[in-house]
């Protein structure tokens, strides 16, 4: 599948130059589709690739309103997570997500480690013991992940954080399923909403984290956490809902 051209250049050019490892991770047709352990494994590997490719861009964003280390830290964490994948026993999707979450907590510095660690740990808790994830399972997992991130970071919409990409992604996904969309189409709509939420952070004044210290000067800059969150939601859609 060819990835749509992204709105921002990264370290190695436009985001559109990256393509996922698989064109279609779905089993089955129509609404009744699911993704399995191997598909989740590919998702994690694909996200690690994206973060590695966009490391410098994420760090550039963070240099404007943060500690200039978001891309570096996220890349360190995802590379460490890759090293854990081969040691996982195939089958339990939740265990795979949890392994990633625990690794991110222990290896990613700053606020990103606890927040992304919580996100993946909540995905793991919601899918614990499952060998496949269906559309409703992912809705529950995404909802749990967003709630976990909010609880950990005490963030609300328009605080200029990763929540500003994740909440629209969750809401769009749930709305799409409610409209009768397929799993794949719901994932695509989720990614589109996450991108819109990410862009909407640009004019916001930060109310959380290091960026909040800048006050009004934080306006006019895209939030790096919202950007890496959009990249995650986009990678889910690109890997599992390939055209």
Regions found by a protein language model. Give the residues of each.
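Alpha-helical and His/Cys-centered functional microenvironments
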Residues: 4-6, 12, 31
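N-terminal loops that bind phosphate or other acidic moieties
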Residues: 1, 25-243
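Basic polycationic patches enriched in arginine
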Residues: 2-5, 21
């Amino acid at each position: 599948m060819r990835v749509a051209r992204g709105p921002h250049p990264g370290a190695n050019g436009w985001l559109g130059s990256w393509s996922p490892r698989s064109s279609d991770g779905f089993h089955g047709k129509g609404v009744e589709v699911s993704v399995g352990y191997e598909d989740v494994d590919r998702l994690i590997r694909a996200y690690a690739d994206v973060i590695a490719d966009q490391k410098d861009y994420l760090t550039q964003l963070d240099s404007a309103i943060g500690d200039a280390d978001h891309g570096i830290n996220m890349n360190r964490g995802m590379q460490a997570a890759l090293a854990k994948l081969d040691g996982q026993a195939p089958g339990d999707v939740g265990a795979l997500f949890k392994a990633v979450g625990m690794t991110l907590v222990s290896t990613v510095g700053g606020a990103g480690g606890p927040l992304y660690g919580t996100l993946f740990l909540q995905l793991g808790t919601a899918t614990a013991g499952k060998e496949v994830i269906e559309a409703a399972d992912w809705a529950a997992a995404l909802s749990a992940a967003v709630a976990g991130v909010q609880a950990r970071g005490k963030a609300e919409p328009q605080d200029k954080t990763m929540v500003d990409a994740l909440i629209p992604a969750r809401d769009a996904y749930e709305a799409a399923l409610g409209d009768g969309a397929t799993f794949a189409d719901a994932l695509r709509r989720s990614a589109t909403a996450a991108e819109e939420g990410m862009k909407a952070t640009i004019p916001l004044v930060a109310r959380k984290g290091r960026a909040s210290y800048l006050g009004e000067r934080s306006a006019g800059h895209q939030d790096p956490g919202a950007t890496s969150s959009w990249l995650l939601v986009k990678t889910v859609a690109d890997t599992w809902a390939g055209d």
